[in-house]
Design a protein with these regions (language model features):
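Substrate-binding and catalytic surfaces of secreted/luminal carbohydrate-active proteins
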Residues: 4-221
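Lectin-like carbohydrate-binding module/patch detector with strong preference for beta-trefoil
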Residues: 215-271
Length: 271
């Protein structure tokens, strides 16, 4: 339930949790609360219920960064399971993990940045930064397979445009093929300070960090797309997608692949 829609009071929630505890079917199922979309209200609800809870849970569609972070810290200090059951952006996952979140559930599709963060988060966090007034965060992880990636994200509804500078102290590296260089700036678009759902794009991104003799090139230009197995090329002749063999100068074999605009909406890691 959430308090904003008349779905019940704290007392109602407390009584329901008590009834669930009496039912043996729930012996091995975590009973969860606060469950508010406004993270400023999560702790008051959680604190009122916690002696009948196994899990503290919130998500972030309103409220302050301070209370979002403090919620997970408090739940862990109480010895309970910390959850965010409605992650709207990779930013919420990064912040949650930094302050104790143990379980997260994506709201909407787990696109590229989100999926890569899920894998990377089982590895080693190399760097983390946040801008609380702007509701943004960034991090660098080394995944279990050794892949190094930079992540950036924003609040779905409350972010302010923020730039993060990633610095390699040890070596020259390539950021999505750009390099060799020591620094890279990621700009995360948002709205005006103090605004709500005005100018927001729910922006998030993942950037590959590579070095050595075999690095990812910058993807931005005209390409032919080849099927590795058949050695056929993707052809768009007369508006119909077919496979073809290479022909010099045939325009229907040429594909323009360019980075999407950062304000496209959601994950802008794509082309």
């Amino acid at each position: 339930p959430d308090y904003g829609w008349g779905q019940g009071t704290q007392e109602d929630f407390y009584n329901i949790a008590g009834e669930l505890r009496k039912n043996p079917r729930f012996d091995h199922i975590r009973i969860s609360g606060g469950n508010t979309l406004n993270c400023d209200q999560a702790l008051p609800w959680y604190n009122a219920l916690k002696d009948r809870l196994d899990e503290g849970n919130t998500h972030q569609l309103a409220g302050s960064f301070d209370n979002f972070a403090q919620f997970f810290t408090t739940v862990r200090e109480d010895g309970k399971h910390a959850t965010a059951d409605e992650l709207h952006n990779v930013m919420e996952a990064m912040v949650g993990m930094e302050y104790g979140m143990q379980t997260g559930v994506w709201w909407g599709p787990a696109e590229y940045a989100r999926g890569e963060f899920c894998k990377a988060s089982h590895g080693e966090r190399l760097a983390y930064a946040e801008h609380r007034p702007n509701w943004t965060a960034a991090s660098v992880y080394r995944a279990p397979d050794g892949k190094v990636q930079a992540f950036g994200g924003t609040s779905e509804r409350q972010a302010v445009t923020t730039s993060y500078r990633f610095l390699s102290k040890e070596r020259d590296v390539f950021f999505d093929g750009h390099g060799p260089q020591r620094e890279y700036v990621m700009e995360l678009p948002g709205g005006e300070p103090g605004s709500y759902q005005d100018g927001q794009t729910n922006a998030e991104q993942v950037v590959s960090i590579t070095w050595g003799d075999d690095v990812q090139p910058v993807v931005d230009g005209t390409y032919v797309l080849i099927n590795k197995s058949s050695r056929k090329l993707l052809d768009n002749e007369n508006g119909s997608l077919t496979s073809s063999t290479y022909s010099t100068g045939k325009k229907s074999l040429q594909w323009h692949v360019n980075p999407v605009d950062a304000r496209i909406g959601g994950d802008f890691s794509y082309h």
